[in-house]
Amino acid sequence: LQSGDRVATLAWNDYRHMETYYGSACSGFVCHTINPRLFPEQIVYIINHAEDRYVFLDPDFWPLIEGIAGECTGVEGWVIMTTREHMPETDRANVLCYEEVMAAQSADFEWPELDEQAACSLCYTSGPTGNPKGVLYSHRSTVLHTYATLIPDAMNISSGDVMLPIVPMFHVNAWGNPYACPVAGAKMVMPGNKMGDGPTLAALINEEGVTMSAGVPTVWLNLLSHLRESGERVELSLIHI
């Protein structure tokens, strides 16, 4: 891989996705987050249009990718973000295990000096007309947005907060939370593929002492429905939604 190359992700909110966010962008590559809710032909289009060389994906999405991988002509490897024992069965030769790739790397890495105007991440719209449109974010714009989200009249995230980011990391970079929380020193609780599941959200809020969360109204309706049906309560730690 060379500086400026595109590295795509097709994943939920989890720690391996966070590692890929930072590992790719801070190495000089462009992290391209793919929305799995797009139609398969749209995913093929944006992978080819972005010229993604590698795609990092959660095992959940392998059935989707296996059906379209042959049409993604520029992809050199599909990295499944799991351990060897949880790898899906496939006959494709260019499928790699994330944890094996990580284990094979040296612990010593010299981070490059990057131009602040260079591209950091890439998102595609899901607009109503034509194919999705790509939007590049620079390192500078990402840093400025991160600072802006931390001010009191915005997210006001601090080192004492525990953030549960439910908005997907493939949706405008989870509204900047993957960058803002580490800068502030806030703890992040990652819901994985259960980000819309009421019982899981209630358990995470109570067990981890979540103080802040970000998500669309549908998610909160799912949580509210679960609480009403089960009689369960969430702790008063959650003060900012």
Q: Model regions: which residues?
A:
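Short hydrophobic alpha-helices that are characteristic scaffold elements of the AMP-binding
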Residues: 22-27, 49, 171, 182-183
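Structural core segment of the AMP-binding/adenylate-forming
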Residues: 26-103, 206-209, 216
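Conserved AMP-binding
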Residues: 11-14, 35, 157, 166-171
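Conserved small/polar residues in nucleotide/adenosyl-binding loops
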Residues: 125, 239-241
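Adenylate-forming
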Residues: 12, 57-66, 84-85, 167, ...
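Conserved AMP-binding/adenylate-forming
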Residues: 1-41
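Conserved adenylate-forming
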Residues: 1-2, 105-118, 122-164, 176, ...
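Conserved AMP-binding/adenylation subdomain of ANL enzymes
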Residues: 143-162, 172-211, 221, 226-227
